[in-house]
Amino acid sequence: MRFNKTYLLSNATKIPDYLEKEQVVEILRAAKLCSQRDFLLLRFMWRTGVRVSEVINVTPNDIEYKNSVVNIRKAKGRPQLRVLLDQETLRMLSDYVLALNTPEDPPVFPISRAQVFNLVKRYGDTGDLKIHPHTLRHSFAIHLVRSGMELRRLQLLSGHSSLSITQVYLQFKDDDLREAYERVSF
């Protein structure tokens, strides 16, 4: 399976690889069959766009269930980042944390960076995809842009230090360009 060929309209620069939603769902389905932790970790990364170093440091105390927010401590370039979480993932996360039943505040996903890279690669291989954890972050951003999210808001959600970093996600597949072109009436 191949990644999507994408371009920035301004200078046809290749941008980061990403997965279509269907590909992410396929990977999540494979993970769910093997491990609840792996499934939730991958879903959390895709639905929040967090980096590996950020997800492995999330503790139960970082989760604000009432506000559907997770506080990411030690976020790259910032002391803290607040990411939003959809209700379904929040519910799964709540159930998972309750099942951990630990009196302390250990990481929700007690796993190393190398282990995250390995499991992402393993589940990607099930769909013949050569991916890495940051592919999920890129996919998160692309899906939000395609859904109409403004770049400034995506910048805040992603924790990017500048808007120019976020602009890389203003990309279009060949099919997207064709569809937009055909909608124009001459």
Task: Identify the meaning behind each predicted range.
Residues 1-186:
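Conserved catalytic core of the tyrosine transesterase superfamily
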